Amino acid sequence: NDDGIPLYIVRAFEIANEFAPNVSLVYNQHAGMEPLMWKKILETILYLKESGLRVDGIGWQAHLKDVEDLAMDKEKLDFFASLIDWTHANGMDFHVTEMDYRIREDPPLNESLQRQSAAYSNIIKILVSRKDSGVVTFNTWGMIDRPGIHTGGYRFLFNKDLKPKPAMFAIKRTL
């Protein structure tokens, strides 16, 4: 529209506000922690709310890769925490809607499994640290490593033999 907000997003929230009054409406984003991109998302959410549309939460699809440092980089983790703070300050919930951490090595190296563990743990630590200021939730993209278009790459908490990986133990320790 003239305000630079994608019309399909505005229309989606108009329809949802009209026909789903009892359903939680979450703006769900698939991307990393790039400040410029998130600036635009936050502007879009404020625009929707200022237009009288209900937005109940922000979701982040955390599809991480071992070659990225997002879940290990203090600056990016601090930015992630600030997003949760902003969300709560604006009366919304924050959801990690789909987390996975893809390792491409076959079989995965122990160092990669340790980075995967740290990534899951770091994200959950931040969520837990923000639980008293508003709703935070955590969901995984899947549980068991297995071949498939969206499941390959040793990305989940259990191996193909249903044995917990180090990341599962890291989550338990973190909680």
PLM features: what roles do these ranges have?
Residues A16, I58, F138, I171:
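Conserved, mostly hydrophobic/aromatic
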Residues T97-M99, Q114-K160, M168:
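Substrate-binding cleft of secreted/luminal carbohydrate-active enzymes
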